């Protein structure tokens, strides 16, 4: 098991969580939306064919030789058609930003 360090950049950010000890990765939580006004604290409307940037409010240190992968949750992808714009987000171990 590899250790990934997460750092919250604001107090109101949710740290990533793991669904179980056998989970393949961590669940990320939305913190803010770029160029978009949410309907309320829990609802965001993405128009058909539209895109929004969703920030997590965290930074992380990925161990050398590994990468961070951002994938759509299966339920959102199949039921709602929501997925990262490029389908898979790749974060290199040496990326800082």
Q: Can you annotate each of these PLM segments?
A:
Residues 1-97:
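DUTPase catalytic domain/fold
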């Amino acid at each position: 098991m590899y250790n990934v360090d997460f750092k919250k950049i604001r107090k109101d950010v949710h740290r990533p969580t793991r669904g179980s000890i056998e989970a393949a990765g961590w669940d990320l939580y939305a913190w803010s939306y770029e160029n978009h006004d949410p309907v309320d604290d829990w609802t965001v409307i993405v128009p058909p064919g539209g895109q929004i940037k969703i920030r997590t409010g965290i930074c992380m240190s990925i161990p050398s030789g590994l990468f961070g992968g951002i994938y759509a949750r299966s339920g959102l992808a199949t039921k709602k058609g929501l997925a990262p714009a490029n389908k898979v987000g790749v974060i290199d171990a040496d990326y800082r930003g």
